[in-house]
């Protein structure tokens, strides 16, 4: 399946709502109030040449979530690192871009008054990259590493 993208996350109707109809993430968030909202976006945008455009979309999303979830604690999660071998493949999915976009997410979180969760330490090796055994494609986590990521979130929120 195709993941979500920061520029269309508020308009793509790819969520099944409680009434069975398709809706947006924003529609789903409007169905009830939550104590916490977690945002995990950015991997699909690693090739974007304009970081300010990414930050603008991210800010718009946070502002909208703050409007419809005024009492929720909102967390922006860092983009997880990729494996060293994946990072060296010569395209936009590399750990240099991950670091650049994570800095942007951190800045937006600070500017909008939400929490930034640096999840890298949950899954990265000593060198800061995703261990080769953590992923079959260098990007997406195997279940053991999903558990590490989830436990980090539970322990830190």
Placement of each model-derived feature along the sequence:
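A generic local structural motif
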Residues: 23-26, 61-62, 102-103
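N-terminal cationic-hydrophobic initiation segments that often serve targeting/anchoring roles
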Residues: 29, 65-67, 109
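Active-site segments of SGNH/GDSL-like serine hydrolases
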Residues: 40-44, 66-98
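Charged helix-capping and loop-helix junction motifs
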Residues: 51-61, 98-101
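Catalytic His-Asp segment of secreted/periplasmic serine-dependent ester chemistry enzymes
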Residues: 81-157
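Structural recognition of the beta-strand scaffold that forms the well-ordered cores
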Residues: 35-40, 73-78, 115-118, 140
């Amino acid at each position: 399946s195709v993941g979500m993208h920061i520029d269309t996350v508020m308009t793509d109707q790819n969520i099944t709502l409680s009434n069975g109809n398709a809706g947006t993430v924003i529609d789903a968030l409007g169905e009830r109030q939550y104590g916490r909202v977690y945002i995990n976006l950015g991997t699909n945008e690693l090739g974007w040449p304009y970081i300010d455009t990414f930050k603008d979309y991210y800010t718009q999303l946070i502002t909208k979530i703050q409007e419809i979830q005024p009492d929720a604690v909102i967390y922006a999660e860092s983009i997880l690192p990729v494996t060293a071998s994946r990072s060296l493949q010569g395209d936009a999915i590399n750990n240099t871009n991950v670091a650049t976009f994570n800095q942007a997410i951190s800045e937006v979180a600070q500017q909008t008054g939400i929490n930034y969760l640096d999840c890298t330490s949950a899954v990265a090796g000593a060198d800061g990259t995703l261990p080769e055994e953590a992923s079959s494609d260098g990007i997406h986590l195997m279940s053991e590493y999903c558990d590490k990521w989830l436990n980090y979130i539970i322990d830190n929120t």
